[in-house]
């Protein structure tokens, strides 16, 4: 029986290995992690991550050919293929701080693999890594190999949280990069045969190592670029009276452009987009391409601008102060159908409002109070380091309360901010919410999911990104 081990039981490693176990019953799959609480959660009825469809797959395969363990060295030693899915956070100190990827955990994993291995192995990069990382990993393995042979492959993930299981079942493509040597081609073929159990051959793309590594960074940069492009247009729409939804639709009907990722919003979030673009910027700078670096840096700048613009719109609309005013935040996760809060725009919006001394009440159906308080008290980039390296007891932000009910969150509020596009927010009783709010009652829709006309009929003053402005808002422009 072929044995696969994945180092890292996070948002990528867990779902990916669960689907491989489901689709390949003849392969034994072990997911390992040094975090005891995380592995305990994977072995319980309450999985550590929320992903539609994941629970059923794990329950179906766990204990048969899918195992979760903290015995990292044992499972690495026994594996034929080792996936490495550890964090590659942005460096916070030293050379490249604020831009470069921190490969500390990757290097540590590589050294451990070399140390415990007693047979030849295929080592697969699953984490998003800078171009040429495979070369560095090869050197570490080669100089510590004790005669054992390793083949390095790049197999980047292209999952979208909230639809990860569907993405794994029916991927647009599976990308495998390897060395262009007989041994490299053989390793690529071995991994290709795993995916061929359910992915059509035409959707499995093979490239050299460097192309595969760069393709992942490029894909995320292109997606984020589309979001920043439509968000830049949303600012212009507000200034001219155009409707960004109509503009996006008109643009998206062009077959050369398409309609995906053209929804204006408060900004993009998630673990990958900003981190990968900053990494891309750093790689361009290191390769003597300052103009290219500056081009990609603008994608991040527009995203920051959009979040700042949203906060400024809130404050300026409410008589230029939110001091001691209750502001309800509906949604804290970076997108619907996930509990992931990494780089969520809600963090920056909340911090901006807290800076103006607002009292914030937050409701999200999948994010815990502990996580919200941690996010609002943590320094930038610290979130992407393992939990045991984060502050043990983050400071509680006293101006923030977290509820498990949207109506409780909005009671006596001066304003409601919709920051995650959860479906349930569309069907709330907004007449009830309006009746229990301070007047004038404001709604700031950061995801453009609200029925604006209906809300205005109820009596709300509504701001929706990129839409024609409410007369009230026209008199109080937002300045950045």
Swiss-Prot record:
Substrate binds at residues 157-161, 216-223, 256-269, 334-335, 447. It holds the Pfam family UDPG_MGDP_dh. The gene is UGD4. NCBIfam families: NDP-sugDHase (TIGR03026). It catalyses: UDP-alpha-D-glucose + 2 NAD(+) + H2O = UDP-alpha-D-glucuronate + 2 NADH + 3 H(+). One of its GO terms (molecular function) is NAD binding. Induction: Specifically down-regulated by H.schachtii (cyst nematodes) in nematode-induced syncytia. Keywords: NAD, Oxidoreductase. It is an enzyme of class 1 (oxidoreductase). This is UDP-glucose 6-dehydrogenase 4. NAD(+) binds at residues 3-20, 33, 38, 90, 128, 161, 275, 342. The active site is at 272 (nucleophile). Signal peptide: none annotated. Pathway: Nucleotide-sugar biosynthesis; UDP-alpha-D-glucuronate biosynthesis; UDP-alpha-D-glucuronate from UDP-alpha-D-glucose: step 1/1. Its EC number is 1.1.1.22. Disruption phenotype: No visible phenotype. It comes from Arabidopsis thaliana. Involved in the biosynthesis of UDP-glucuronic acid (UDP-GlcA), providing nucleotide sugars for cell-wall polymers. Belongs to the UDP-glucose/GDP-mannose dehydrogenase family. One of its GO terms (biological process) is UDP-glucuronate biosynthetic process. Inhibited by UDP-xylose. InterPro entries: 6-PGluconate_DH-like_C_sf (IPR008927), NAD(P)-bd_dom_sf (IPR036291), UDP-Glc/GDP-Man (IPR017476), UDP-Glc/GDP-Man_DH_C (IPR014027), UDP-Glc/GDP-Man_DH_C_sf (IPR036220), UDP-Glc/GDP-Man_DH_dimer (IPR014026), UDP-Glc/GDP-Man_DH_N (IPR001732), UDPglc_DH_euk (IPR028356).
